[in-house]
């Protein structure tokens, strides 16, 4: 299923659990983050996340605006 068009109802369970990259996804049960910079275990990252840039493992965690 196309991760950009898969259904991600607000507050609902995510049907694209393994590749949740839906724009504006607000699922509460995404198995992975909706933006590549967020760690999979960050529940907040299933909602509004903005990537700030950076490189490396540590920067990956730091640059995610919703994982603080």
From Swiss-Prot:
This is Metallothionein-3. A divalent metal cation 7 binds at residues 51, 64, 66-67. The lineage of its organism: Eukaryota, Metazoa, Chordata, Craniata, Vertebrata. Residues 31-68 are annotated as: Alpha. It comes from the Eukaryota. A divalent metal cation 6 binds at residues 38, 42, 45, 67. It comes from Macaca fascicularis (Crab-eating macaque). A divalent metal cation 4 binds at residues 34-35, 45, 49. Residues 1-30 are annotated as: Beta. GO terms for biological process: activation of protein kinase B activity; cellular detoxification; cellular response to cadmium ion; cellular response to copper ion; cellular response to reactive oxygen species; cellular response to zinc ion; detoxification of copper ion; energy reserve metabolic process. A divalent metal cation 3 binds at residues 16, 20, 25, 30. Keywords: Acetylation, Copper, Metal-binding, Metal-thiolate cluster, Phosphoprotein, Zinc. Belongs to the metallothionein superfamily. Type 1 family. The modification N-acetylmethionine is found at residue 1.
């Amino acid at each position: 299923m196309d991760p950009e068009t898969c259904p991600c109802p607000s507050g609902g369970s995510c049907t694209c659990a393994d590749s949740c990259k839906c724009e504006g996804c607000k699922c509460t049960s995404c198995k992975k983050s909706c933006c590549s910079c967020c760690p999979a275990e960050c529940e907040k990252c299933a909602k509004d996340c903005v990537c700030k840039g950076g490189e490396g493992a540590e920067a990956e965690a730091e640059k995610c605006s919703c994982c603080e």
